[in-house]
C-alpha cells in the first residue's frame, strides 16, 4: 500500500519514518560532488585570469547556464545587462547594416578586393606576410563607404566602425588607446566564432596632414604609430599600462580616404597596407545609379543617358539629383499648408507627411542636373573667401541667386 503525504507537517511530525527519509534526502542533496572535466571546461573561457575581455560586454554569457534564481532580469529594469559602455558600443561602434536593402549594386572588383583581403587575414598562409590594413582611396563622393557596407553585409560581417572625428582628442593618447580598444573588441568577437573587422572611415582626414593650414598634433603622430605597431604585431595588441604576453585573434582592418599621400609614409608601405584605388567604371556608375533610381521606374537606357550626360560627376551627384527633383512638390506643399503651419505638420502631427512619387523622366533629371552643375561652377568661379570685399560676382549666369522655378 502506497501512502501519499500532502504536507510537510505530516511528513515531519506525524510520521517518524518519513522525517528520517526527508533528512537523508537533504543530506544527499548537500553532498559536494567533484566536478568532471566537462564541467570545468565549461567555465574555462570566463574564469579569472583566463578571460582576456577588455570590458563587460559579455556578462550575459552565463545566461541559461546557472540557476534561474541567480540570473538577473533583462530589459530596462534588469540587472543582467552589459552596462559599462555596451549600449554605446552596440549603438555606435558596431554596425549591423540591417537597414541596407537588397537591390543595390556591388562592384565585382570592389567585392573581390575586400573578400580576398579579409580571407587572407583569416588564413594561415605559410611564410607569407599578409598586409593587415586595406586602404581604399579615391575621389570624393564615389561611394567608397557604401560599397564597403554592401561588401560587409554580403560577407555577413558586422564590423567595429571608427570615424575620422575619433582620431583627435583634447587628451594626448586617447585616440591611440581607442584604436587599441576597438581592435580588441573586434578580436573578442572573432574569439567567439564570428567574423569581424575594424573599419575606419576617412583615415586621412583624421590622421593626415592637409597642408600648412592644419597642425600636426601628438595624437596624429600616435595614431600613425599605433596603426604601424598593430600592423606589425596584429596578434599582440595591448592596452596602455597592460603588458601580458597573450595572443589574440588577428583582425583585418579596412580604411577609406581621399588622399593617402597625406599619411605618414611608413604606414602606407606595402608590407603594412594594401592600397586600392577605387575609380568606378562606366558600368559601375550605371549599376549604382540603377540602385538609386530603382523605385522610380527609370529604365536602364535612361540611366545610361543620364550617366553619359554628366560624365565627370561623382556617384553621390545622382543621389542629390534624385532628392532635388522633389523640391517642386515640397514647395507646393509648403504653399498649400502655409509657412507658419508647417511646424505643426512636420513635428507635432499624429501622421507623417506622405509625398506621392514624382515622375522622373530623362528630361526632368537632366534639367535638375544642369542646375546642380551650375551651383558647382558658381562655387569655383566666385571664390568669395578669396575676394570677399573685392566685388565678387553674383551667383548665376544672369546675376540671380533665386532658386529655379521660383516665382515672385
UniProtKB/Swiss-Prot annotation:
Question: Can the keyword Transit peptide be found in this entry's annotation?
Answer: yes
* InterPro entries noted in UniProt: ATPase_AAA_core, P-loop_NTPase, RCA-like, RuBisCO_activase_AAA_helical
Ligand binding (ATP): 138-145
Name its cellular compartments. Plastid, Chloroplast stroma
List keywords of the entry alphabetically. Answer: ATP-binding, Chloroplast, Nucleotide-binding, Plastid, Transit peptide
Highest taxon listed in the record's lineage: Eukaryota
Q: How does it assemble?
A: Monomer.
**Protein name per the record:** Ribulose bisphosphate carboxylase/oxygenase activase, chloroplastic
Amino acid at each position: 500500500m502506497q501512502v501519499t503525504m500532502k504536507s510537510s507537517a505530516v511528513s515531519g511530525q506525524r510520521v517518524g519514518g518519513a522525517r528520517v527519509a526527508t533528512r537523508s534526502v537533504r543530506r544527499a542533496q548537500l553532498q559536494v560532488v567533484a566536478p568532471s572535466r566537462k564541467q570545468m571546461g565549461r567555465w574555462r573561457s570566463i574564469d579569472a585570469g583566463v578571460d582576456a575581455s577588455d570590458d563587460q560586454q559579455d556578462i550575459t554569457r552565463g545566461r541559461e547556464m546557472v540557476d534561474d534564481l541567480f540570473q538577473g532580469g533583462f530589459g530596462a529594469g534588469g540587472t543582467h545587462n552589459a552596462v559599462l559602455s555596451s549600449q554605446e558600443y552596440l549603438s555606435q561602434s558596431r554596425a549591423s547594416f540591417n537597414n541596407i536593402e537588397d537591390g543595390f549594386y556591388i562592384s565585382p572588383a570592389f567585392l573581390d578586393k575586400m573578400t580576398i583581403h579579409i580571407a587572407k587575414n583569416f588564413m594561415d598562409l605559410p611564410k607569407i606576410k599578409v598586409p593587415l590594413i586595406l586602404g581604399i582611396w579615391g575621389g570624393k563622393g564615389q561611394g567608397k563607404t557604401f560599397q564597403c557596407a554592401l561588401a560587409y553585409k554580403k560577407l555577413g560581417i558586422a564590423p567595429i566602425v571608427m570615424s575620422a572625428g575619433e582620431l583627435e582628442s583634447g587628451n594626448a593618447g586617447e585616440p591611440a588607446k581607442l584604436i587599441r580598444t576597438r581592435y580588441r573588441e573586434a578580436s573578442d568577437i572573432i574569439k567567439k566564432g564570428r567574423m569581424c573587422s575594424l573599419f575606419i572611415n576617412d583615415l586621412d582626414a583624421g590622421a593626415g596632414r592637409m597642408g600648412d593650414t592644419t597642425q600636426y598634433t601628438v595624437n596624429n603622430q600616435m595614431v600613425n604609430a599605433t596603426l604601424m605597431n598593430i600592423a606589425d604585431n596584429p596578434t599582440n595588441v595591448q592596452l596602455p599600462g597592460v603588458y601580458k604576453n597573450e595572443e589574440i585573434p588577428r583582425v583585418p582592418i579596412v580604411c577609406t580616404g581621399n588622399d593617402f599621400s597625406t599619411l605618414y609614409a611608413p604606414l602606407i608601405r606595402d608590407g603594412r597596407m594594401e592600397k586600392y584605388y577605387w575609380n568606378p567604371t562606366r558600368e559601375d556608375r550605371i549599376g549604382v545609379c540603377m540602385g538609386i533610381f530603382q523605385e522610380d521606374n527609370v529604365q536602364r537606357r535612361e540611366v545610361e543617358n543620364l550617366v553619359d550626360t554628366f560624365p565627370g560627376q561623382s556617384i553621390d551627384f545622382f543621389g542629390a539629383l534624385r532628392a532635388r527633383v522633389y523640391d517642386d512638390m515640397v514647395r507646393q506643399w509648403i504653399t498649400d499648408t502655409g509657412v507658419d503651419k508647417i511646424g505643426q505638420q512636420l513635428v507635432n502631427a499624429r501622421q507623417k507627411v506622405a509625398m506621392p512619387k514624382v515622375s522622373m523622366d530623362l528630361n526632368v533629371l537632366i534639367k535638375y542636373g544642369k542646375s546642380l552643375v551650375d551651383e558647382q561652377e558658381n562655387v569655383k568661379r566666385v571664390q568669395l573667401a578669396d575676394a570677399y570685399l573685392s566685388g565678387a560676382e553674383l551667383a548665376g549666369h544672369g546675376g540671380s541667386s533665386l532658386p529655379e522655378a521660383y516665382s515672385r
